[in-house]
Amino acid sequence: SNEIYYYATGSGNDFLRDIAGASADAPVLINDYIKDLPTVTVQGKTYKFLNGIGYGIDGYCCEVGDRLREQGDSKIDYTGIAIKGLLFHYKPRDAVITVDGINCPYKKVWLAPTMNGRYYGGGMMPTPNQNRLGLNRSLSVMVFFGSSKLKTLAIFLSIFKGEHINHRHNIKVLCGHEI
């Protein structure tokens, strides 16, 4: 059981932001954060994840970002992709979110990330109260649903401060062990 440290490099340090604040000048011991990681199964293959797993417009943004990355070395603006996708390209879907065996149906789901930490996607905070080292080691899913394009855009911008959860008619945060 060696000590494992994380040192921030690059621009997307959502993991570091979650465990040590906005920045860290020194390496951070991460052993506690990488044991018993949650898993996701996609097309029969199981993967562990550190921060979050997306559903909805964030998946669309990753697809567009991957295509742009193949075209050149310019920095990918995921927020810009999300806003353009929301206004012109992405269509919300109806979804059933299952949390610890309880099915919760939602109409017009724009976003539904399952989170181990609080941050992902370049500083978005979909589940501001999520605690990756909480006593029960639960996960959170934030469901953004039922809103028009304009209202979605207005609410979406508040996700970077975690204030979107105040829009209770369109945002639900559910917690559980199996999502």
Label the model's feature ranges.
Residues 101, 133-136, 143-179:
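ATP/nucleoside-binding phosphotransfer catalytic cores, i.e., glycine-rich phosphate-binding loops
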Residues 110-116:
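Short hydrophobic core segments
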Residues 69-78, 117, 121-151:
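Gly/Ser/Thr-rich active-site loops/lids in small-molecule metabolic enzymes
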Residues 16-17, 63-64, 123-126, 153-154:
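Short, glycine/acidic-enriched capping/hinge loops at junctions between secondary-structure elements
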Residues 92-96, 138, 178:
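Exposed beta-strand and adjacent loop surfaces of beta-rich binding modules
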Residues 13, 53-55, 59, 118, ...:
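Flexible, active-site-adjacent loop/turn segments at secondary-structure boundaries
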Residues 2-110:
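Catalytic core of DAGKc-family lipid kinases
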